[in-house]
C-alpha cells in the first residue's frame, strides 16, 4: 500500500542515534496542510521568499519556548542553587534564523559554535509545536546522572546511559541565560540519509555556551542560594532573577508566520558558504585613543571638553621652541611632548605619553631638566601631569576590573597585548558585556575582538576606563555574542581602541 507524505509523521532531534527513524501513521494531517497552504499561490506553487522584514518565529512561539525553558529549569532535580532566569535574545534569534535557512542537519555555522550552544529539532507530517522539541530535549534527563560535588575531583564525570544527554544539559545549563530560536520550512531536507519533502526545522541558540567538559550543568543546593551578585539577591520560582528582565522583548517590524518560506534558488546566483555566515556581523574599528601630535601642540589646543588621555610624540622635540610652564604640574598652555621630555617620560626619540588633567593650581615652578628649561608662573590656571605608557601582556580572561578600574578623575591602563584565539576562550570566564562601551567585568581581549579593534590572532589594544553605565547592550559581532546588563551594582566600564 502506498502512503502519501501527509500520512506519515517523522520526528527527530539532532544527535539521536544515527539509524533508521521510525514512522507512525497519522490519520489526519489537516493542521499542517492549513499551515503550509499559506505559502502557496493560486497555482499551488511555493512563494518566493520576501526580503527579510519578518522574523522566522511568532511571538506566541517565542513566548512558549521561553516559558517552557524557564519552567523546566526551575524544576530540575537535584535542585539548583545558581540556575539563572532565561530571556530572549534577538541576536541569537538572527543567528538561529541564518542557520535554519541553510537546511543542513548538523550544528553550525562552525565559526559560531565555539561561542554559542545549540539544539536542533526537525519533523514532518502532523503539526508539532516547537515546545514538542524543547520537551524532548529535556526528557533526556532520564538517562543523565547528575555529578555531585564530591564526585568532581577536580573535573566532574559525564554519565549518560542513553544515546545522548547534551540537549538536556544545554537546556538546564545554569549560566546559559539567553536564548534565540528560529523555524524554517526545508524542502527535501537530508536527515541522516533520508529525504524529508517538507521538514519543519527548529534551531535554538544559547548564550553563554553550555556543555563545558568537566563541569556540572548547575550547582546543587537550595534554590537561588548561589546566584551571581549581579542579580542582587533576586529569586523567582527557583531561578536567579533580576527585576525587569522578563519585560524586555526586541521590537518587531512586522508579525511573521510560523514557518519561514525557503528562498528560491533560481534567482540566487551566489552560493552561500560557512565563511559568509562568519562575516555577516563583521565590525572593524580603526579608532585610536592615542592622538598623534607635533612638538608644538599644547594640551589647551588639543583637548577642549573631551577626554584626552594618550598622545604620540614625534622625534626631535628638544629642538622645538615651544614653551613649557611648570614642573611636575604643567600649565595647560605647555607643549605636551616637551613637558613629557622635561619630566623624563620620553626622550628626544619621541614616544607615547599619558595625560591626566589636574584642575587649577595657584602657581607653577620653573626648572631645567633633561635639556628643557621651563617657565615659572605665579597665577592660577588649569594644570596637567604626564605619565609613562606601559605595556602589559594579558590573558583572554583578564578584565579591566582586575587590571585598571576607573577612579575619578581619570585612570590610565597599560597598553595591552592580547594573545591569540580569545574567540575560543570559555565565555563563562571571559565574558563580554555591552557593545562599544563594556562593563569592566568583561574580558579585555574578547571585548576588543567583539569591537573589531583587534582580530583573533591577537595584538595591541588601548583601554580607556570610564564611569559606569546604567545599560549595557547585547550584540553579535565578529563571532562573539556580548551580554546585556541593566543597572549593575557598583561596576565601572571601559572602551577599547585600536593601536595602529
From Swiss-Prot:
Keywords: Disulfide bond, Repeat, Secreted, Signal
Organism: Homo sapiens (Human)
InterPro entries in the cross-refs: Allrgn_V5/Tpx1_CS (IPR018244), CAP_dom (IPR014044), CAP_sf (IPR035940), CRISP-LCCL_domain (IPR051957), CRISP-related (IPR001283), LCCL (IPR004043), LCCL_sf (IPR036609)
PROSITE patterns found in the cross-reference section: CRISP_2, LCCL
CDD domains: CAP_CRISPLD1 (cd18813)
Cited SUPFAM superfamilies: LCCL domain (SSF69848), PR-1-like (SSF55797)
A GO-annotated cellular component: extracellular exosome
Residue stretches of biased makeup (Basic and acidic residues): 254-280
Domain LCCL stretches: 289-384, 390-492
Protein name per the record: Cysteine-rich secretory protein LCCL domain-containing 1
GO biological process annotation, one example: face morphogenesis
Domain SCP: 66-206
Disordered: annotated segments: 254-281
SS bonds (residue pairs): 295-313, 317-337, 396-418, 422-445
Signal peptide: 1-23
Annotated PANTHER family: CYSTEINE RICH SECRETORY PROTEIN LCCL DOMAIN CONTAINING 2 (PTHR31331:SF1), LCCL DOMAIN PROTEIN (AFU_ORTHOLOGUE AFUA_5G08630) (PTHR31331)
Keyword Lipid metabolism appears in the UniProt entry: no
Record's subcellular location: Secreted
Family: Belongs to the CRISP family.
Amino acid at each position: 500500500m502506498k502512503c502519501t507524505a501527509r500520512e506519515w509523521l517523522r520526528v527527530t532531534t539532532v544527535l539521536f542515534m544515527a539509524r533508521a527513524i521510525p514512522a507512525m501513521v497519522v490519520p489526519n494531517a489537516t493542521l499542517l496542510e492549513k499551515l503550509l497552504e499559506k505559502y502557496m499561490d493560486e497555482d499551488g506553487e511555493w512563494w518566493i521568499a520576501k526580503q527579510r522584514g519578518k522574523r522566522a518565529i511568532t511571538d506566541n512561539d517565542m513566548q512558549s519556548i521561553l516559558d517552557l525553558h524557564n519552567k523546566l529549569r526551575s524544576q530540575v532535580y537535584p535542585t539548583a542553587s545558581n540556575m539563572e532566569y532565561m530571556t530572549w535574545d534577538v541576536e541569537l534569534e538572527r543567528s538561529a534564523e541564518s542557520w535554519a535557512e541553510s537546511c543542513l542537519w548538523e550544528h553550525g555555522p562552525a565559526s559560531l559554535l565555539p561561542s554559542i550552544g545549540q539544539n536542533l529539532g526537525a519533523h514532518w507530517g502532523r503539526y508539532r509545536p516547537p515546545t514538542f522539541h524543547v520537551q524532548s530535549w529535556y526528557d533526556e534527563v532520564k538517562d543523565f546522572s547528575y555529578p555531585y560535588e564530591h564526585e568532581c575531583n577536580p573535573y566532574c564525570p559525564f554519565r549518560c546511559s542513553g544515546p545522548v544527554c547534551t540537549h538536556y544539559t544545554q537546556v538546564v545549563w545554569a549560566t546559559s541565560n539567553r536564548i534565540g530560536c528560529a523555524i524554517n520550512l526545508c524542502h527535501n531536507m537530508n536527515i541522516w540519509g533520508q529525504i524529508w519533502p517538507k521538514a519543519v526545522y527548529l534551531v535554538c541558540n544559547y548564550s553563554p555556551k553550555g556543555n563545558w567538559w568537566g563541569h556540572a550543568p548547575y550547582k546543587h543546593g537550595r534554590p537561588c542560594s548561589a546566584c551571581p551578585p549581579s542579580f542582587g539577591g533576586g529569586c523567582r520560582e527557583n531561578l536567579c532573577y533580576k527585576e525587569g528582565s522578563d519585560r524586555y522583548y526586541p521590537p518587531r517590524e512586522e508579525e511573521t508566520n510560523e514557518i519561514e518560506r525557503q528562498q528560491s534558488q533560481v534567482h540566487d546566483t551566489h552560493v552561500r558558504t560557512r565563511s559568509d555566515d562568519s562575516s555577516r556581523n563583521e565590525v572593524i574599528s580603526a579608532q585610536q585613543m592615542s592622538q598623534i601630535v607635533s612638538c608644538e601642540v599644547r594640551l589647551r589646543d588639543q583637548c577642549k571638553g573631551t577626554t584626552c588621555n594618550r598622545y604620540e610624540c614625534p622625534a626631535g622635540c628638544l629642538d622645538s621652541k615651544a614653551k613649557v610652564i611648570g614642573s611636575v604640574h604643567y600649565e595647560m598652555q605647555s607643549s605636551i611632548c616637551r613637558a613629557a621630555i622635561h619630566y623624563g617620560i620620553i626622550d628626544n626619540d619621541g614616544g607615547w605619553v599619558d595625560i591626566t588633567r589636574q584642575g587649577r593650581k595657584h602657581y607653577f615652578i620653573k626648572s631645567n631638566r633633561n635639556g628643557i628649561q621651563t617657565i615659572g608662573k605665579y597665577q592660577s590656571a588649569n594644570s596637567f601631569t604626564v605619565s609613562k605608557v606601559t605595556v602589559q601582556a594579558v590573558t583572554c580572561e583578564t578584565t579591566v576590573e582586575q587590571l585598571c578600574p576607573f577612579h575619578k578623575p581619570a585612570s590610565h591602563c597599560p597598553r595591552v597585548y592580547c594573545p591569540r584565539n580569545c574567540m575560543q576562550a570559555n565565555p563563562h570566564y571571559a565574558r563580554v558585556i555591552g557593545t562599544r562601551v563594556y562593563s569592566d567585568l568583561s574580558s579585555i581581549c574578547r571585548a576588543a575582538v567583539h569591537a573589531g579593534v583587534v582580530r583573533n590572532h591577537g595584538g595591541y589594544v588601548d583601554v580607556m576606563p570610564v564611569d559606569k553605565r546604567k545599560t549595557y547592550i547585547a550584540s553579535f559581532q565578529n563571532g562573539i555574542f556580548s551580554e546585556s546588563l541593566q543597572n549593575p551594582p557598583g561596576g565601572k566600564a571601559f572602551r577599547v581602541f585600536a593601536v595602529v
